[in-house]
Amino acid sequence: MKAFTSEKKIAASSEKIFKAFEDPTLLGKWWGPAGFTITSNTFEFKPGGKWSFVMHGPGGNTYPNETIFQKIARPNKVAIRHDSNPHFTVTATIEDIKGGAIIRWHQDFDSEDVAKNIAHIVKPANEQILDKLKALVESTQQVL
């Protein structure tokens, strides 16, 4: 298995969830596992646009990341190619349902061996990312 899929029901519209992708300040609040923060250096939210950022871990470690927005289809899809190690593509699809939306997060690694070796990290990290996104967009204090 070289791909991991998670989904989360969120009590918000697909448009509101999509806005959390297109705004680098908002994206930095939820992208990454629990305890991580993001500093964006370059953010070009368009197909082929670059997103260069640094993840700051809870222990003080920093992780530079280089990505490219492969596909953007407002308000239902964002595909992001991660060109730093490990190499993968994340495709987020957002579907409106009664009472909110479902986001499906599909992370496909280039290497099956790499995916197997880090599955114990990736699976919970993806759930934490979606939990952070849900908390942000469902917050009555956060205006999107």
Model region roles, listed by residue range:
Residues 1-37, 42:
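Hydrophobic ligand-binding cavity/cleft-lining segments
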Residues 79-128, 144:
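Beta-strand/loop substructures that line and gate deep hydrophobic ligand-binding cavities in soluble
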Residues 14-15, 46, 70-75, 93-102:
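A short, structured loop/turn motif at beta-sheet edges
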